[in-house]
Amino acid sequence: CVLKPTFLAASQGVLRANAPDEFSTAFRTLQEMLADPELRKRGGERAKWVLVEDYLPGREVSLEGVLTDGRLQTLALFDKPDPLTGPTFAEMLYIAPSRLPEAVQQRIRKEVEQTAQALGLTTGPVHAEARIHQGKVWMLECAARTIGGLCSRMLAFSGGMSLEALILRHALGR
């Protein structure tokens, strides 16, 4: 399984456990990490929450897009070529454009759009991460935000426009 602190970002504290003893060790590690007074001050009770998910093998991708009336416009589809198999999941490399076959890319776009609609997202930025497992697209996360950290620096649009400027222009209807 995979343990994910819900209050952290950038895959911080995301740990894989393959057996009960590994789960106990990973959970204790997270309890110590999440006991940080500064983190507790910022996050309150939520800073202690941990999500536990099944581990899903497969090739991982990330999609950046904008939604307009529920329709997805893909801005970038990134391959994550490093195998993200655990025990930690630090993402070090993104490749764009994706090298996946066009049919697979279309399935990813469709799955992201349907997931965003199911979450009630209709307008604005969307960041999604998925894995391709046994030929199927599995959503790992989908959120009404842009890619985190300094990763947006990888993207430049018409006239050198940044991702942030593009999102602001979209919000203003331009």
Where are these regions (language model features)?
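A short, structured beta-strand-centered segment in the mid-to-C-terminal lobe
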Residues: P97-Q105
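Active-site "cap" helix and flanking loop/linker of ATP-utilizing ligase/carboxylase catalytic domains
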Residues: Q106-A128, A143-R174
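A short catalytic or substrate-binding loop motif that flags glycine-/basic-rich loops and adjacent residues
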Residues: L8, Y55-G58, G120-T123
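Conserved ATP-binding module of the ATP-grasp superfamily
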Residues: V2-L3, P20-P57, T88-Y94, E113-A118
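Conserved anion/nucleotide-ligand pocket segment
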Residues: C1-A17
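Beta-strand scaffold of nucleotide-dependent catalytic cores
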Residues: L15, T25-T29, L51-D54, E60-P81, ...
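Short glycine-enriched, charge-decorated loop/helix-capping segments at active-site entrances
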Residues: L93-A96, A156-F157
